[in-house]
């Protein structure tokens, strides 16, 4: 199989059950979420989440085996993976553009139902120089630490790369905890007019991306501890770093538009 895969200029994917189990898990997860919304029963939701997590772990394990131990990630394959990550991030940019469009469409010309003002009548927005500003500083600091880790890997400095990755993961966890606290103390809900809807959908999806990025970086941290990255073969880390910088930039736009200008 190794010889066959290296004798042609194509990225041949081995047979894998994980796309199927991932699709089944996603179906169960969305069905369970709908059930949870209506009946407050999380059983089906937790089953779907378990299937998704197990699929992720085993799918990533197979990709690591192919790229690190079998040598299947040739230069052409790596180029394809890079373009795939670039296109994925581009699709995420358009995804968040729709949220900003909804926010500015509502805020630049408030309707009479909103009291002809923004924020709408009765809405007490967050103070942008409190938790939101702290979260901004946390993500900016995490951008510095992930860059530190990247340069350390390219310079074959194992210990500093480990430190940079560890600090980035910790900052990601800290951001998520602060976001949860902010939601818990929020003086408005997702049902409070279009302001509440756009606020929680935009910041909530960004928070989900922070959790995904933190998981991605935690995986890279574990792989680095197992000496699976070299100075010229570490695209898994590069992809995680690109994704994390994207999350940073999106948060800056969220902070400036929703927290600062929108308040």
UniProtKB/Swiss-Prot annotation:
Gene3D superfamilies: 1.10.287.70, Cytochrome c oxidase, subunit III, four-helix bundle
Biological process terms in GO annotation: mitochondrial electron transport, cytochrome c to oxygen
Matching InterPro entries: Cyt_c/ubiquinol_Oxase_su3, Cyt_c_oxase_su3_dom, Cyt_c_oxidase-like_su3, Cyt_c_oxidase_su3-like_sf, Cyt_c_oxidase_su3_a-hlx
Top-level taxon of the source organism: Eukaryota
Membrane spanning stretches: 9-29, 40-60, 84-104, 129-149, 161-181, 198-218, 241-261
Swiss-Prot/TrEMBL catalytic activity: 4 Fe(II)-[cytochrome c] + O2 + 8 H(+)(in) = 4 Fe(III)-[cytochrome c] + 2 H2O + 4 H(+)(out)
Alphabetic keyword roster: Membrane, Mitochondrion, Mitochondrion inner membrane, Translocase, Transmembrane, Transmembrane helix
Membrane disposition: Multi-pass membrane protein
Subcellular location: Mitochondrion inner membrane
Chief localization: mitochondrion
EC number: 7.1.1.9
Cellular component GO terms held in the UniProt record: mitochondrial inner membrane
Keyword Transcription: no
A Pfam cross-reference name: COX3
Keyword Ribonucleoprotein: no
GO terms of molecular function: cytochrome-c oxidase activity
Subunit structure as annotated in this protein's UniProt entry: Component of the cytochrome c oxidase (complex IV, CIV), a multisubunit enzyme composed of a catalytic core of 3 subunits and several supernumerary subunits. The complex exists as a monomer or a dimer and forms supercomplexes (SCs) in the inner mitochondrial membrane with ubiquinol-cytochrome c oxidoreductase (cytochrome b-c1 complex, complex III, CIII).
Protein family: Belongs to the cytochrome c oxidase subunit 3 family.
Its job: Component of the cytochrome c oxidase, the last enzyme in the mitochondrial electron transport chain which drives oxidative phosphorylation. The respiratory chain contains 3 multisubunit complexes succinate dehydrogenase (complex II, CII), ubiquinol-cytochrome c oxidoreductase (cytochrome b-c1 complex, complex III, CIII) and cytochrome c oxidase (complex IV, CIV), that cooperate to transfer electrons derived from NADH and succinate to molecular oxygen, creating an electrochemical gradient over the inner membrane that drives transmembrane transport and the ATP synthase.
Protein name: Cytochrome c oxidase subunit 3
Lineage: Eukaryota, Metazoa, Ecdysozoa, Arthropoda, Hexapoda
Gene: COIII
């Amino acid at each position: 199989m190794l010889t066959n895969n290296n004798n042609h200029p194509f990225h041949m994917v081995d047979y894998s059950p994980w796309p199927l189990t991932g699709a089944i898990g996603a179906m169960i997860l969305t069905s369970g979420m709908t059930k949870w919304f209506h009946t407050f029963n999380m059983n089906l939701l937790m089953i779907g989440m378990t299937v998704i997590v197990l699929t992720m772990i085993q799918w990533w394990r197979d990709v690591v085996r192919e790229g690190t131990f079998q040598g299947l990630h040739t230069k052409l394959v790596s180029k394809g993976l890079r373009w795939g990550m670039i296109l994925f991030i581009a699709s995420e940019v358009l995804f968040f553009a729709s949220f900003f469009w909804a926010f500015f469409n509502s805020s630049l010309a408030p309707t009479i139902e909103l009291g002809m003002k923004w924020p709408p009548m009765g809405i007490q927005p967050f103070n942008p120089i409190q938790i939101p500003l702290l979260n901004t500083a946390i993500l900016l600091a995490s951008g510095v630490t992930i860059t530190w880790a990247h340069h350390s890997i390219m310079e074959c400095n194992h210990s500093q790369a480990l430190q940079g990755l560890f600090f980035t993961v910790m900052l990601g966890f800290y951001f998520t905890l602060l976001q949860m606290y902010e939601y818990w103390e929020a003086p408005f809900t997702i049902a409070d007019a279009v302001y509440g809807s756009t606020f929680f959908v935009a910041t909530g999806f960004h928070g989900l991306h922070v959790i995904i990025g933190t998981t991605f970086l935690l995986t890279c941290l574990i792989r680095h501890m197992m000496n699976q990255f070299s100075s010229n073969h570490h695209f898994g880390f590069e992809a995680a770093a690109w994704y994390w910088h994207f999350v940073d930039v999106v948060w800056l736009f969220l902070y400036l538009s929703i927290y600062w200008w929108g308040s």
